[in-house]
C-alpha cells in the first residue's frame, strides 16, 4: 500500500529515459514531492502527448511557488522548442487575494512566503525560452503572453481569485487539444480552487476529469482537432 507503480511504457519499454533527470527537478529541495509520483507522471505523460501531437502553443504555470513543477514544464518546453511562462508574485499570497477565503488560515498564508524570484530561477534553470511574469495575476500578464497561444497550462494558486482569473485568461488561448491542469481541486484544503473550477465548468459548459494525485488535480482539454 502507498507504493506507486511506474507506467508500463517506462518499466517495459524505456519510453521515458528522461525520468531520472525530471524526478530530480521535481524533488530538488522538497523530498515530500517524491511521494506524489501520480502527479509527476500525469504531468509528464500529458505534456509529452500534447506537445508531441501539437506543433504550436507555449507552456505556462500560474502559481510557481519555489519552481519544482515549473522546472518539469520548462524541461519539456526546452525539449520541444516552446516558450514557458512562469507567473507568480514570488512573495506568497497578496492580502487582497485572500479576502473572503474562509479556509485560508494565517498558517497557510505564511507557508507560501518562503520563496523568491531568485530561488525559483535557480530551481527552474536558465532556459532561454522561459518568460518570468512577476506580480499579481492578471496584472503580471505581458503583451507577449497576451498574444500567445498555449498547449499546456498548470494552475496551482490554491485560492479562488487567481484560479478564476487564470481559467478566464488561458481557456480562449488554448490550442485545440491543449490541456489545463488545476491543482488542489479535490484536496479539501482549498475550497476556493473547487469553486473557481466549478463556476468555470458551468459558464463554459465543459467537463474534465479528476486525477488521483495527492491533491486532486482537475484536468481540462480544449475541444477540437
Segments predicted by a language model, with ranges:
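N-terminal auxiliary segments of SAM/dcSAM-dependent transferases
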Residues: 1-7
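S-adenosylmethionine/decaboxylated-SAM
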Residues: 10-37, 52-225
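Conserved alpha-helix/loop element of class I SAM-dependent methyltransferases that forms part
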Residues: 41-54
Amino acid at each position: 500500500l502507498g507504493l506507486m507503480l511506474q507506467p508500463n511504457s517506462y518499466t517495459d519499454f524505456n519510453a521515458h529515459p528522461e525520468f531520472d533527470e525530471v524526478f530530480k527537478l521535481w524533488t530538488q529541495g522538497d523530498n515530500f514531492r517524491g511521494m506524489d509520483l501520480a502527479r509527476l507522471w500525469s504531468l509528464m505523460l500529458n505534456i509529452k502527448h500534447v506537445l508531441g501531437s501539437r506543433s504550436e502553443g507555449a507552456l505556462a504555470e500560474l502559481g510557481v511557488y519555489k519552481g519544482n513543477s515549473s522546472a518539469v514544464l520548462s524541461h519539456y518546453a526546452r525539449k520541444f522548442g516552446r516558450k514557458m511562462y512562469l507567473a507568480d508574485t514570488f512573495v506568497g499570497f497578496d492580502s487582497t487575494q485572500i479576502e473572503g477565503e474562509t479556509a485560508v488560515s494565517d498558517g497557510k498564508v505564511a507557508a507560501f512566503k518562503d520563496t523568491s524570484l531568485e530561488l525559483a530561477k535557480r530551481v527552474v534553470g536558465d532556459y532561454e525560452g522561459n518568460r518570468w511574469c512577476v506580480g499579481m495575476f492578471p496584472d503580471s500578464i505581458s503583451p507577449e503572453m497576451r498574444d500567445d497561444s498555449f498547449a499546456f497550462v498548470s494552475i496551482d494558486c490554491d485560492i479562488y481569485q487567481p484560479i478564476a482569473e487564470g481559467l478566464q485568461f488561458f481557456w480562449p488561448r488554448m490550442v485545440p487539444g491543449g490541456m489545463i491542469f488545476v491543482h488542489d481541486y479535490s484536496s479539501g484544503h482549498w475550497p476556493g480552487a473547487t469553486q473557481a473550477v466549478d463556476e468555470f465548468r458551468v459558464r463554459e459548459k465543459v467537463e474534465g476529469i479528476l486525477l488521483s494525485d495527492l491533491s486532486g488535480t482537475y484536468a481540462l482539454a480544449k475541444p477540437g482537432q
